[in-house]
């Protein structure tokens, strides 16, 4: 099942309480072109895959779309196939932990920032995907996937105009299965402390780590970029280009 919720008032949504989808878990897409502020008291109960979408329209199979003008009873029943971002609101994650379940997590917006220990975490093979004008991680914030024994790790895919690590960490961890890949692409990457890692602890290798930017990569020598297998998994590539 999938639940859509959109905000049309022109102000950013402040999420600092509990969103509970009831007895049956469902994927949740929150849409607000003006953006989101996710505070430390936020909790998501019975939520499968979570998407925070700070753009202006969602496209569905068959050509239908959901925007701020679409009538509530005209919501398409087909699968969403694209997110339209002619305008982008900002997404701030302040001391909150998004995800944690076995499903995926996606954030699509303008300036996306994690600070004061904010985190985007998935377990059980769920992927984390971020599409942003700019992404900043500071104050010990984390984007990560963690997978249990025998299960392949979830991937982290980031596409942003600028990516800045100010003491933040991007990491995939697999206890026994193949580690999840980390792919960071976009315009420029700057690190001032922090890390980008894929780690495995079993017989399978860690995932590949790739930072592929069109413009510049800087500060990597002051940070930690690694793909490490602390078992029998062998070597995995780290690519900067």
For the regions a language model picked out, list residue spans one by one.
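Residue-level marker of intrinsically disordered, low-complexity segments enriched
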Residues: 5, 17, 64-66, 73, ...
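Short amphipathic alpha-helical surface micro-motifs
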Residues: 10, 32-36, 41, 111, ...
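Solvent-exposed loop/turn tips at the surfaces of repeat/solenoid architectures
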Residues: 55, 96, 110, 117, ...
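Tandem-repeat/low-complexity and Cys-motif detector
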Residues: 96-97, 120-121, 143-151, 170-177, ...
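Short loop/beta submotifs within extracellular cysteine-rich repeat domains
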Residues: 59, 113-114, 134-139, 151-152, ...
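Glycine-centered small-residue motifs that form tight turns
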Residues: 102-105, 122-132, 150-161, 176-187, ...
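Solvent-exposed adhesion/ligand-recognition segments of exported proteins
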Residues: 1-125, 131, 136-141, 146
